[in-house]
Regions:
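Glycine-rich beta-alpha junction loops
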Residues: 1, 23, 81-83, 112, ...
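Conserved N-terminal subdomain of the carbohydrate kinase-like
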Residues: 1-49
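Acidic, amphipathic alpha-helical patches
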Residues: 35, 96, 167
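Structural alpha-helical scaffold elements that stabilize or flank donor/cofactor-binding regions
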Residues: 37-38, 99, 132
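Conserved beta-alpha-beta core of the PfkB/ribokinase-like small-molecule kinase fold
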Residues: 52-128, 146-147
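Conserved phosphate-binding/catalytic region of the ribokinase-like
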Residues: 66, 119-190, 194
C-alpha cells in the first residue's frame, strides 16, 4: 500500500494530519534496495524522519546517510515531525536528534524547534541547536505566516511570509522552501562547508 496522508485545515491556518500507513510501502524499504551508487554520484543527500519510524527503513536511511557522508555529499535534513506516525514522542525526539547530528543543512519548523529545544524564541532555539550540533552550517526555520529565518555563521536573515489572498492550504510550503534552499545551495556551493 502507498501511505496516505489526510490534512484537516482549520480557519486559523493550523493543520492536523492523520495517516493510513500500517504497513505502507515507505516503511518497507530495506538496506539492500537502496541505490548506493546513485548516492555516490550525487552532490547532495536530503532525508527526514518519516523514513526513520520503523526499523527496516530506519536502517536503510542510516546506511544511505553513511554512504553520502563517506562520499562528501552535502547532507540536508528536515525533521518533518508527524506525531501520529511515531510509537512515542521520545522515539521521535531521539531520531530527530540523530538527524541533527548528521546534517550540514537543516530545515526545521517553528513547532519542531520548540519540540527539540524547549523554547519558542527562534534565535535562542537556533543558537541551542547550532551549539549542540556544530555540524549544522546552515539552519533554516519556517514559521508559517510569521515568515522564515536563516542562520549561517554570524548571519541571521528574516523573510516575511508571502501569502496570496484566498490561500486555502499551505501543506507542502515548507518542502518547497527547503527545495529552493537546496537548489540555491547546489548552484552557489561547490562543496560542503564542513
Amino acid at each position: 500500500n502507498t501511505t496516505l496522508a489526510f490534512v484537516k485545515n482549520y480557519e486559523n491556518g493550523d493543520r492536523e494530519f492523520s495517516f493510513y500507513r500500517h504497513p505502507g510501502a515507505d516503511m518497507m524499504l530495506s538496506s539492500d534496495e537502496v541505490e548506493y551508487e546513485q548516492i555516490k554520484q550525487s552532490r547532495l543527500f536530503h532525508f527526514g524522519t518519516l523514513s526513520m519510524t520503523d526499523d527496516n527503513v530506519k536502517e536503510a536511511t542510516k546506511r544511505a546517510i553513511e554512504t553520502a557522508k563517506n562520499n562528501g555529499l552535502i547532507i540536508s535534513f528536515d525533521p518533518n515531525l508527524r506525531p501520529p506516525l511515531w510509537k512515542s514522542l521520545d522515539d521521535a525526539r531521539n531520531q530527530i536528534a540523530y538527524g541533527l547530528s548528521q546534517c550540514d543543512v537543516l530545515k526545521i519548523s517553528d513547532n519542531e524547534i520548540e519540540f527539540m529545544t524547549g523554547t519558542s524564541d527562534f534565535d535562542k532555539g537556533a543558537n541551542i541547536l547550532m551549539e549542540r550540533y556544530p555540524n549544522i552550517k546552515l539552519l533554516n526555520i519556517t514559521a508559517g505566516a510569521d515568515g522564515s529565518y536563516s542562520y549561517y555563521r554570524e548571519i541571521r536573515a528574516y523573510v516575511p511570509s508571502y501569502l496570496l489572498g484566498g490561500t486555502i492550504d499551505t501543506t507542502g510550503a515548507g518542502d518547497t522552501f527547503c527545495g529552493s534552499v537546496l537548489n540555491l545551495s547546489l548552484i552557489h556551493i561547490s562543496e560542503p562547508t564542513r
